[in-house]
Amino acid sequence: MQNVHKRVIKDINDGMKNLKQEFGIYLAPEEDDFYKVHFILQGPEGTPFEGGLYHGMIRLNNDHPFRPPNLHMITPSGRFEAEKYPISPNSRGICTTATSFHPESWTSMNNLETVLKGFVSLMCDPYDGGVGAVKSTDTQVKKLAQDSLTHIGNDLMVQKLFPDLYKAVNNGTFKPVKLAELSKIVYKEPTKPIVEEKSAKTSKSSTKTSVKSKKNQKSDSEEEENSDDDNTDSDSESDDFRDLDDVVDDSDQESDDESDSSSESENESGGSDDESDDGSDDESDDETSESDSESEEEKPVKKSTRKISKTTTKSSSTKPVKSIKSSKSTTTKPTKPTKSTKTTKSTKSTKSTKSTKPTESTKSSRSVKTTESSKSSKSSKSSKTGKK
């Protein structure tokens, strides 16, 4: 079985239907080779070919519709050369703009209908010569038109491919069909329901777009509400942190007051110690005791600062407002050790005052005592000399 391209079958089916209705042209392919398509033309009205029947063949290329076909005439017409069937494969047939003689004018949009329509118009123009064309008088053409019926009645390919036409010709019942009586191809125009369907589709699409827009508006409003909630949460967190800062500031002020009172008491105690004769020994003992107390105080300060840092990290990581409020209660308790942190700073400053001021006073007191003793010794010596 021969492999036939879909385009070949389509062109044959379209040609068999449309050409017969419009021009009275019969069309049929060979059973063994669909690339050999036979046709029978009726002589056009008002021409010397009127009343005649003309058998021909179109040989399609294997790569149809990308290359033009060849066209051959089998029935003598007085206009083109006639060939005997079977036609030689080396024959190029008749020269037309739609055959292999002019491949530059061929396009893949051409089909069997365009080839045969062009051939009919060329047949009616006796002055257009070319390869395969024959010059004949009108009387010769008319005589060949009458003889064409007997030729068709003896053609075996016509009997095989067009049996109804073959019987009508041999029985004498064949009547040529006038082109004016042939029904034209009716092209269907779009009806109103199609327009209504289109409008319905457009309305559906518009409703879909409106639904999408509503969904987008809802999503936008939800996003705005979520952003507002986040802002309120952040504001509440910032307020809570501000409250914590206020608590820490209050504790700092209390620690400063206590440090001032402790410094005054230490200054008084330092002054009483400096008036004693063993000031130097007491000062060394005080310094050692103070250094020991400072070292002891610094240890809990470090621990307390670590606790505060942990509590602050916990409060920053928690987003809900309730958890932040609970962090307040936890952070207020470790604020007490912060007093010791700032008292240590104040003790350092007081240390310098202790080490400087008492030493000067002691030195001055000692110098005063020495001067007084020296003066008393001198006065005693002078009194002794006076007595002598």
UniProtKB/Swiss-Prot annotation:
Keyword field: ATP-binding, Nucleotide-binding, Transferase, Ubl conjugation pathway
Annotated stretches, region: Disordered: 195-388
Chemical reaction(s) catalysed: S-ubiquitinyl-[E1 ubiquitin-activating enzyme]-L-cysteine + [E2 ubiquitin-conjugating enzyme]-L-cysteine = [E1 ubiquitin-activating enzyme]-L-cysteine + S-ubiquitinyl-[E2 ubiquitin-conjugating enzyme]-L-cysteine
EC number: 2.3.2.23
Biased composition range(s): Low complexity: 310-388
Alphabetical list of CDD domains matching this protein: UBCc_UBE2J (cd23799)
Keyword field contains S-adenosyl-L-methionine: no
InterPro entries: Ub_conjugating_enzyme, UBQ-conjugat_E2_core, UBQ-conjugating_enzyme/RWD
Pathway where it operates: Protein modification; protein ubiquitination
List of catalytic residues: C95
One BP annotation, GO: protein ubiquitination
SUPFAM superfamilies linked to this entry: UBC-like
Gene Ontology MF terms in the entry: ATP binding; ubiquitin conjugating enzyme activity
Domain UBC core: from-to ranges: 3-162
Acidic residues biased stretches: 221-238, 246-297
Taxonomy, superkingdom: Viruses
Family the UniProt entry places it in: Belongs to the ubiquitin-conjugating enzyme family.
Role noted for this protein: Catalyzes the covalent attachment of ubiquitin to other proteins.
Name of the protein this chain belongs to: Probable ubiquitin-conjugating enzyme E2 L709
Species for this entry: Acanthamoeba polyphaga mimivirus
Organismal lineage: Viruses, Varidnaviria, Bamfordvirae, Nucleocytoviricota, Megaviricetes
